[in-house]
Amino acid sequence: MYHLKCIECGAEYSRDEVIYTCSKCDGLLDVIYDYSSIKIDMEKLKTECPSVWKYAKLLPVEREPVTIQEGGTPLYKCDRLAEKIGIKKLYVKHEGMNPTGSFKDRGMTVGVTKALELGMNTVACASTGNTSAALAIYGAKAGIPVVVLLPAGKVALGKVAQALMHGAKVLSIRGNFDDALALVRTLCSQEKIYLLNSINPYRLEGQKTIGFEIADQLDFKVPDRIVLPVGNAGNITAIYKGFREFKILGITDSLPKMTGIQAEGSCPIVKAIKSGAPAITPEENPETVATAIRIGNPVNATKALSAIRESGGTAESVTDEEILAAQKDLARLEGIGVEPASAASVAGLRKLVDMGVIGRDETVVCITTGHLLKDPQTVIDVCEEPTVVDANIDAIREAIFGKAK
Protein backbone atom coordinates (compact mmCIF):
# COMPACT_ATOMS: atom_id res chain seq x y z
CA MET A 1 0.00 0.00 0.00
CA TYR A 2 1.12 3.55 -0.65
CA HIS A 3 0.01 7.18 -0.58
CA LEU A 4 1.40 10.64 -1.34
CA LYS A 5 2.94 12.92 1.28
CA CYS A 6 4.22 16.49 1.13
CA ILE A 7 7.92 16.71 2.00
CA GLU A 8 7.40 20.21 3.46
CA CYS A 9 4.25 20.25 5.62
CA GLY A 10 3.50 16.52 5.85
CA ALA A 11 0.02 16.71 4.29
CA GLU A 12 -1.10 13.36 2.91
CA TYR A 13 -3.06 12.53 -0.23
CA SER A 14 -4.77 9.48 -1.63
CA ARG A 15 -3.05 7.58 -4.41
CA ASP A 16 -6.23 8.08 -6.47
CA GLU A 17 -5.86 11.88 -6.58
CA VAL A 18 -4.47 13.61 -9.65
CA ILE A 19 -2.08 15.96 -7.88
CA TYR A 20 1.53 17.04 -8.46
CA THR A 21 2.36 19.35 -5.55
CA CYS A 22 0.83 19.92 -2.13
CA SER A 23 -2.49 21.80 -2.28
CA LYS A 24 -1.72 23.36 1.12
CA CYS A 25 1.86 24.66 0.69
CA ASP A 26 2.83 23.79 -2.91
CA GLY A 27 5.58 21.51 -1.60
CA LEU A 28 6.90 18.53 -3.53
CA LEU A 29 5.21 15.18 -2.99
CA ASP A 30 6.76 11.79 -2.33
CA VAL A 31 5.29 8.31 -2.64
CA ILE A 32 5.19 6.66 0.79
CA TYR A 33 5.00 2.87 1.10
CA ASP A 34 4.13 0.53 3.93
CA TYR A 35 7.44 -1.32 3.77
CA SER A 36 6.33 -3.82 6.40
CA SER A 37 3.81 -5.19 3.91
CA ILE A 38 6.35 -5.63 1.09
CA LYS A 39 7.83 -9.10 0.93
CA ILE A 40 10.85 -9.54 -1.35
CA ASP A 41 11.82 -13.00 -2.63
CA MET A 42 15.61 -12.73 -2.44
CA GLU A 43 16.20 -15.86 -4.48
CA LYS A 44 14.08 -14.46 -7.31
CA LEU A 45 15.72 -11.06 -6.93
CA LYS A 46 19.17 -12.61 -7.30
CA THR A 47 18.34 -14.73 -10.35
CA GLU A 48 15.94 -12.65 -12.44
CA CYS A 49 17.49 -10.35 -15.06
CA PRO A 50 17.36 -6.63 -14.21
CA SER A 51 14.54 -4.54 -15.70
CA VAL A 52 12.25 -1.81 -14.38
CA TRP A 53 9.36 -4.18 -13.76
CA LYS A 54 11.51 -6.73 -11.95
CA TYR A 55 10.96 -4.40 -9.00
CA ALA A 56 7.18 -4.13 -9.42
CA LYS A 57 6.54 -4.65 -5.69
CA LEU A 58 8.28 -1.32 -5.09
CA LEU A 59 6.42 0.57 -7.81
CA PRO A 60 3.06 2.39 -7.35
CA VAL A 61 1.10 0.66 -10.11
CA GLU A 62 -1.68 -1.93 -10.03
CA ARG A 63 -2.48 -2.38 -13.73
CA GLU A 64 -0.57 -4.02 -16.58
CA PRO A 65 2.33 -1.70 -17.40
CA VAL A 66 2.92 0.22 -20.61
CA THR A 67 6.37 -1.11 -21.39
CA ILE A 68 8.88 -1.38 -24.22
CA GLN A 69 11.34 -3.43 -22.14
CA GLU A 70 13.15 -0.54 -20.48
CA GLY A 71 15.82 -0.92 -17.84
CA GLY A 72 18.42 -3.64 -17.53
CA THR A 73 21.05 -1.22 -18.82
CA PRO A 74 24.72 -2.22 -18.70
CA LEU A 75 27.03 -1.43 -15.81
CA TYR A 76 30.48 -1.26 -17.37
CA LYS A 77 33.70 -1.69 -15.38
CA CYS A 78 35.94 1.02 -16.82
CA ASP A 79 39.55 0.21 -15.99
CA ARG A 80 41.23 2.40 -18.63
CA LEU A 81 39.16 5.43 -17.71
CA ALA A 82 39.75 4.76 -14.01
CA GLU A 83 43.50 4.69 -14.60
CA LYS A 84 43.41 8.00 -16.47
CA ILE A 85 41.34 9.66 -13.74
CA GLY A 86 43.42 8.10 -10.99
CA ILE A 87 40.98 5.93 -9.04
CA LYS A 88 40.98 2.20 -8.35
CA LYS A 89 37.48 1.15 -9.28
CA LEU A 90 35.08 2.90 -11.67
CA TYR A 91 31.83 1.71 -13.19
CA VAL A 92 29.64 3.49 -15.72
CA LYS A 93 25.90 2.83 -15.70
CA HIS A 94 24.94 3.64 -19.29
CA GLU A 95 21.31 4.70 -19.30
CA GLY A 96 21.64 5.65 -22.96
CA MET A 97 21.07 1.96 -23.69
CA ASN A 98 17.37 2.24 -22.79
CA PRO A 99 14.95 1.83 -25.74
CA THR A 100 14.57 5.56 -26.47
CA GLY A 101 18.20 6.32 -25.65
CA SER A 102 17.90 7.84 -22.18
CA PHE A 103 17.04 7.18 -18.54
CA LYS A 104 13.68 8.91 -19.03
CA ASP A 105 12.17 5.61 -20.18
CA ARG A 106 12.16 4.36 -16.60
CA GLY A 107 10.02 7.25 -15.45
CA MET A 108 7.71 7.14 -18.44
CA THR A 109 6.86 3.45 -18.21
CA VAL A 110 5.57 4.10 -14.68
CA GLY A 111 4.18 7.58 -15.41
CA VAL A 112 2.18 6.69 -18.51
CA THR A 113 0.89 3.52 -16.83
CA LYS A 114 -0.20 5.64 -13.86
CA ALA A 115 -1.92 8.12 -16.18
CA LEU A 116 -4.09 5.32 -17.58
CA GLU A 117 -4.75 3.98 -14.09
CA LEU A 118 -6.00 7.43 -13.04
CA GLY A 119 -8.24 7.72 -16.10
CA MET A 120 -6.13 10.40 -17.81
CA ASN A 121 -6.06 9.91 -21.56
CA THR A 122 -3.76 12.75 -22.68
CA VAL A 123 -0.25 13.37 -21.36
CA ALA A 124 2.12 16.34 -21.59
CA CYS A 125 5.55 17.61 -20.62
CA ALA A 126 8.06 20.39 -21.08
CA SER A 127 11.45 19.16 -22.16
CA THR A 128 15.06 19.84 -23.04
CA GLY A 129 14.64 16.85 -25.37
CA ASN A 130 14.88 13.43 -23.74
CA THR A 131 11.67 13.72 -21.74
CA SER A 132 9.69 14.63 -24.86
CA ALA A 133 11.19 11.74 -26.82
CA ALA A 134 10.36 9.21 -24.11
CA LEU A 135 6.86 10.54 -23.49
CA ALA A 136 6.06 10.54 -27.22
CA ILE A 137 7.11 6.92 -27.53
CA TYR A 138 5.33 5.65 -24.43
CA GLY A 139 2.25 7.65 -25.37
CA ALA A 140 2.30 6.00 -28.78
CA LYS A 141 2.62 2.58 -27.15
CA ALA A 142 -0.34 3.38 -24.88
CA GLY A 143 -2.38 4.81 -27.77
CA ILE A 144 -2.96 8.22 -26.16
CA PRO A 145 -2.23 11.79 -27.36
CA VAL A 146 0.99 13.50 -26.29
CA VAL A 147 1.73 17.24 -26.07
CA VAL A 148 5.29 18.49 -25.59
CA LEU A 149 6.64 22.01 -25.14
CA LEU A 150 10.25 22.66 -26.14
CA PRO A 151 12.41 25.80 -25.93
CA ALA A 152 12.73 26.88 -29.57
CA GLY A 153 16.18 26.31 -31.05
CA LYS A 154 17.56 24.84 -27.82
CA VAL A 155 16.90 21.12 -28.29
CA ALA A 156 19.16 18.64 -30.10
CA LEU A 157 17.58 17.54 -33.37
CA GLY A 158 17.86 13.83 -32.58
CA LYS A 159 15.48 14.31 -29.68
CA VAL A 160 13.05 16.51 -31.61
CA ALA A 161 12.99 13.88 -34.37
CA GLN A 162 11.94 11.18 -31.91
CA ALA A 163 9.02 13.23 -30.60
CA LEU A 164 7.86 14.15 -34.11
CA MET A 165 8.15 10.65 -35.57
CA HIS A 166 6.13 9.11 -32.75
CA GLY A 167 3.22 11.48 -33.26
CA ALA A 168 3.49 13.99 -30.42
CA LYS A 169 2.07 17.49 -30.78
CA VAL A 170 5.34 19.43 -30.58
CA LEU A 171 5.23 23.11 -29.66
CA SER A 172 8.45 25.15 -29.79
CA ILE A 173 8.05 28.14 -27.52
CA ARG A 174 9.94 31.41 -27.62
CA GLY A 175 11.52 30.97 -24.21
CA ASN A 176 13.70 28.60 -22.18
CA PHE A 177 12.92 25.29 -20.49
CA ASP A 178 11.76 26.93 -17.28
CA ASP A 179 9.23 28.99 -19.28
CA ALA A 180 8.02 25.82 -21.00
CA LEU A 181 7.60 24.03 -17.68
CA ALA A 182 5.58 26.88 -16.19
CA LEU A 183 3.30 26.85 -19.23
CA VAL A 184 2.74 23.10 -19.29
CA ARG A 185 1.98 23.12 -15.55
CA THR A 186 -0.68 25.76 -16.17
CA LEU A 187 -2.08 23.79 -19.10
CA CYS A 188 -2.37 20.59 -17.09
CA SER A 189 -4.02 22.40 -14.19
CA GLN A 190 -6.71 23.76 -16.50
CA GLU A 191 -7.33 20.76 -18.76
CA LYS A 192 -7.71 17.01 -18.31
CA ILE A 193 -4.10 16.43 -19.31
CA TYR A 194 -1.67 14.47 -17.14
CA LEU A 195 1.64 16.20 -16.42
CA LEU A 196 4.67 13.95 -16.71
CA ASN A 197 7.59 16.15 -15.87
CA SER A 198 9.63 15.06 -12.88
CA ILE A 199 7.54 17.22 -10.56
CA ASN A 200 5.16 14.25 -10.86
CA PRO A 201 6.19 11.97 -7.96
CA TYR A 202 5.09 8.82 -9.78
CA ARG A 203 7.55 9.41 -12.61
CA LEU A 204 10.44 9.49 -10.17
CA GLU A 205 9.40 6.10 -8.84
CA GLY A 206 10.39 4.56 -12.17
CA GLN A 207 13.74 6.32 -12.12
CA LYS A 208 14.64 4.98 -8.67
CA THR A 209 15.08 1.56 -10.31
CA ILE A 210 18.50 2.79 -11.47
CA GLY A 211 19.56 2.54 -7.83
CA PHE A 212 18.00 -0.91 -7.51
CA GLU A 213 19.82 -2.12 -10.62
CA ILE A 214 23.23 -0.81 -9.60
CA ALA A 215 22.99 -2.69 -6.29
CA ASP A 216 21.65 -5.73 -8.13
CA GLN A 217 24.48 -5.72 -10.69
CA LEU A 218 27.11 -5.37 -7.95
CA ASP A 219 25.77 -8.46 -6.12
CA PHE A 220 23.91 -6.22 -3.67
CA LYS A 221 27.04 -4.38 -2.61
CA VAL A 222 26.65 -0.60 -2.53
CA PRO A 223 29.32 1.59 -4.16
CA ASP A 224 30.93 4.33 -2.12
CA ARG A 225 29.66 7.04 -4.42
CA ILE A 226 27.23 7.75 -7.26
CA VAL A 227 28.19 10.61 -9.58
CA LEU A 228 25.60 11.90 -12.03
CA PRO A 229 24.57 14.90 -14.12
CA VAL A 230 21.91 17.14 -12.61
CA GLY A 231 19.35 19.08 -14.63
CA ASN A 232 15.82 19.18 -13.26
CA ALA A 233 17.19 17.22 -10.27
CA GLY A 234 14.71 14.35 -10.28
CA ASN A 235 17.22 11.61 -11.03
CA ILE A 236 19.61 12.20 -8.13
CA THR A 237 16.58 12.23 -5.84
CA ALA A 238 15.09 9.06 -7.30
CA ILE A 239 18.31 7.04 -7.33
CA TYR A 240 18.99 7.89 -3.70
CA LYS A 241 15.47 6.78 -2.81
CA GLY A 242 16.12 3.46 -4.54
CA PHE A 243 19.20 2.83 -2.41
CA ARG A 244 17.35 3.92 0.74
CA GLU A 245 14.50 1.51 0.06
CA PHE A 246 16.84 -1.44 -0.45
CA LYS A 247 18.48 -0.58 2.87
CA ILE A 248 15.10 -0.24 4.65
CA LEU A 249 14.11 -3.68 3.34
CA GLY A 250 17.39 -5.23 4.49
CA ILE A 251 18.55 -6.04 0.96
CA THR A 252 21.67 -3.87 1.36
CA ASP A 253 23.34 -2.40 4.42
CA SER A 254 24.72 1.01 3.38
CA LEU A 255 24.08 4.11 1.26
CA PRO A 256 26.25 5.79 -1.40
CA LYS A 257 27.33 9.41 -1.33
CA MET A 258 25.22 11.19 -3.94
CA THR A 259 27.32 13.57 -6.00
CA GLY A 260 25.64 15.90 -8.48
CA ILE A 261 27.41 17.54 -11.41
CA GLN A 262 26.14 20.61 -13.25
CA ALA A 263 27.51 22.72 -16.09
CA GLU A 264 29.15 25.99 -15.04
CA GLY A 265 26.60 27.95 -17.03
CA SER A 266 23.69 26.26 -15.27
CA CYS A 267 24.53 25.31 -11.69
CA PRO A 268 22.03 26.56 -9.08
CA ILE A 269 22.27 23.36 -7.02
CA VAL A 270 26.06 23.50 -6.90
CA LYS A 271 25.93 27.09 -5.65
CA ALA A 272 23.42 26.16 -2.93
CA ILE A 273 25.53 23.22 -1.74
CA LYS A 274 28.74 25.25 -1.67
CA SER A 275 27.15 28.21 0.11
CA GLY A 276 25.15 26.10 2.56
CA ALA A 277 21.94 27.77 1.42
CA PRO A 278 18.68 25.99 2.31
CA ALA A 279 17.30 26.56 -1.20
CA ILE A 280 18.56 27.39 -4.67
CA THR A 281 18.58 30.78 -6.34
CA PRO A 282 17.15 30.22 -9.85
CA GLU A 283 19.28 31.23 -12.83
CA GLU A 284 17.39 33.17 -15.50
CA ASN A 285 19.55 32.44 -18.55
CA PRO A 286 21.24 29.05 -18.19
CA GLU A 287 23.70 28.20 -20.98
CA THR A 288 25.76 25.10 -21.72
CA VAL A 289 26.60 22.81 -24.62
CA ALA A 290 25.02 20.06 -22.49
CA THR A 291 21.44 20.89 -23.50
CA ALA A 292 19.87 18.14 -21.38
CA ILE A 293 20.99 19.90 -18.18
CA ARG A 294 20.45 23.48 -19.34
CA ILE A 295 17.94 24.21 -16.57
CA GLY A 296 18.13 27.24 -14.31
CA ASN A 297 15.28 26.46 -11.92
CA PRO A 298 15.16 22.70 -11.27
CA VAL A 299 11.79 21.69 -9.84
CA ASN A 300 13.22 18.93 -7.65
CA ALA A 301 15.95 21.10 -6.14
CA THR A 302 14.61 20.71 -2.59
CA LYS A 303 14.69 16.92 -2.83
CA ALA A 304 18.11 16.96 -4.50
CA LEU A 305 19.69 19.17 -1.84
CA SER A 306 18.33 16.82 0.80
CA ALA A 307 19.66 13.70 -0.98
CA ILE A 308 23.13 15.20 -1.38
CA ARG A 309 23.37 16.45 2.20
CA GLU A 310 21.79 13.43 3.87
CA SER A 311 24.09 11.03 2.03
CA GLY A 312 27.26 13.00 2.77
CA GLY A 313 27.75 13.76 -0.91
CA THR A 314 28.57 16.96 -2.72
CA ALA A 315 27.97 18.91 -5.93
CA GLU A 316 30.40 20.44 -8.41
CA SER A 317 30.28 22.34 -11.69
CA VAL A 318 32.32 21.68 -14.83
CA THR A 319 33.05 23.72 -17.93
CA ASP A 320 31.77 22.84 -21.38
CA GLU A 321 35.37 22.08 -22.36
CA GLU A 322 35.68 19.60 -19.48
CA ILE A 323 32.39 17.98 -20.49
CA LEU A 324 33.46 17.55 -24.13
CA ALA A 325 36.86 16.15 -23.10
CA ALA A 326 35.13 13.58 -20.88
CA GLN A 327 32.75 12.70 -23.73
CA LYS A 328 35.76 11.84 -25.91
CA ASP A 329 37.42 9.85 -23.12
CA LEU A 330 34.32 7.74 -22.57
CA ALA A 331 34.16 6.94 -26.28
CA ARG A 332 37.85 6.44 -26.99
CA LEU A 333 38.93 4.67 -23.81
CA GLU A 334 35.84 2.57 -23.06
CA GLY A 335 33.70 2.52 -26.22
CA ILE A 336 30.81 4.26 -24.45
CA GLY A 337 29.10 6.83 -26.66
CA VAL A 338 27.14 9.47 -24.75
CA GLU A 339 25.60 12.87 -25.31
CA PRO A 340 27.37 15.85 -23.67
CA ALA A 341 25.18 16.05 -20.55
CA SER A 342 26.00 12.42 -19.75
CA ALA A 343 29.71 13.12 -19.82
CA ALA A 344 29.31 15.74 -17.09
CA SER A 345 29.41 12.91 -14.54
CA VAL A 346 32.87 11.78 -15.66
CA ALA A 347 34.11 15.37 -15.99
CA GLY A 348 32.94 16.04 -12.45
CA LEU A 349 34.52 12.85 -11.12
CA ARG A 350 37.88 13.81 -12.63
CA LYS A 351 37.69 17.30 -11.12
CA LEU A 352 36.69 16.05 -7.66
CA VAL A 353 39.46 13.42 -7.63
CA ASP A 354 42.01 16.08 -8.59
CA MET A 355 40.66 18.32 -5.81
CA GLY A 356 41.00 15.50 -3.28
CA VAL A 357 37.27 15.47 -2.54
CA ILE A 358 36.82 11.95 -3.89
CA GLY A 359 39.31 9.40 -2.59
CA ARG A 360 41.34 7.41 -5.09
CA ASP A 361 40.38 4.18 -3.31
CA GLU A 362 36.62 4.79 -3.57
CA THR A 363 34.37 2.57 -5.67
CA VAL A 364 32.49 5.00 -7.91
CA VAL A 365 29.57 4.60 -10.29
CA CYS A 366 29.09 7.35 -12.86
CA ILE A 367 25.66 7.59 -14.46
CA THR A 368 25.58 8.42 -18.16
CA THR A 369 22.06 9.49 -18.95
CA GLY A 370 21.73 9.63 -22.74
CA HIS A 371 23.13 8.06 -25.92
CA LEU A 372 25.65 9.67 -28.27
CA LEU A 373 23.13 9.69 -31.13
CA LYS A 374 20.83 12.00 -29.18
CA ASP A 375 23.05 14.95 -30.15
CA PRO A 376 25.21 14.07 -33.18
CA GLN A 377 25.68 17.71 -34.18
CA THR A 378 27.82 18.41 -31.13
CA VAL A 379 30.04 15.46 -32.04
CA ILE A 380 30.45 16.78 -35.58
CA ASP A 381 31.27 20.22 -34.21
CA VAL A 382 34.02 19.07 -31.84
CA CYS A 383 35.62 16.17 -33.71
CA GLU A 384 37.97 16.31 -36.66
CA GLU A 385 36.32 16.10 -40.08
CA PRO A 386 36.66 12.93 -42.21
CA THR A 387 39.70 12.96 -44.48
CA VAL A 388 38.74 13.04 -48.16
CA VAL A 389 41.06 10.98 -50.37
CA ASP A 390 41.20 9.70 -53.92
CA ALA A 391 39.77 6.25 -54.60
CA ASN A 392 43.10 4.43 -54.93
CA ILE A 393 45.20 2.35 -52.56
CA ASP A 394 48.22 4.67 -52.58
CA ALA A 395 46.08 7.58 -51.42
CA ILE A 396 44.59 5.39 -48.71
CA ARG A 397 48.04 4.29 -47.51
CA GLU A 398 49.34 7.85 -47.52
CA ALA A 399 46.36 9.03 -45.45
CA ILE A 400 46.90 6.25 -42.90
CA PHE A 401 50.69 5.90 -42.77
CA GLY A 402 51.88 9.24 -44.15
CA LYS A 403 53.40 7.76 -47.29
CA ALA A 404 52.54 5.49 -50.21
CA LYS A 405 54.10 2.02 -50.42
From Swiss-Prot:
Annotated domain remarks: The N-terminal 41 amino acids are required for activity.
One annotated GO biological process: cysteine biosynthetic process
Cofactor: pyridoxal 5'-phosphate
UniProt xrefs under Pfam families: PALP
GO cellular component, one term: cytoplasm
EC number in record: 4.2.3.1
Function, as annotated: Catalyzes the gamma-elimination of phosphate from L-phosphohomoserine and the beta-addition of water to produce L-threonine. Does not catalyze the conversion of O-acetyl-L-homoserine into threonine.
Top-level taxon in the UniProt lineage: Archaea
Protein name: Threonine synthase
Gene3D superfamilies in UniProt: 3.40.50.1100
Stored PANTHER family: L-THREONINE DEHYDRATASE CATABOLIC TDCB, THREONINE DEHYDRATASE, MITOCHONDRIAL-RELATED
InterPro entries: Ser/Thr_Dehydratase, Ser/Thr_deHydtase_PyrdxlP-BS, Thr_synthase-like, Thr_Synthase_bac/arc, TrpB-like_PALP, TrpB-like_PALP_sf
Protein's gene: thrC
Residue numbers bearing the N6-(pyridoxal phosphate)lysine modification: K104
Keyword Lyase: yes
Protein family: Belongs to the threonine synthase family.
Binding residues for pyridoxal 5'-phosphate: N130, G231, N232, A233, G234, N235, T369
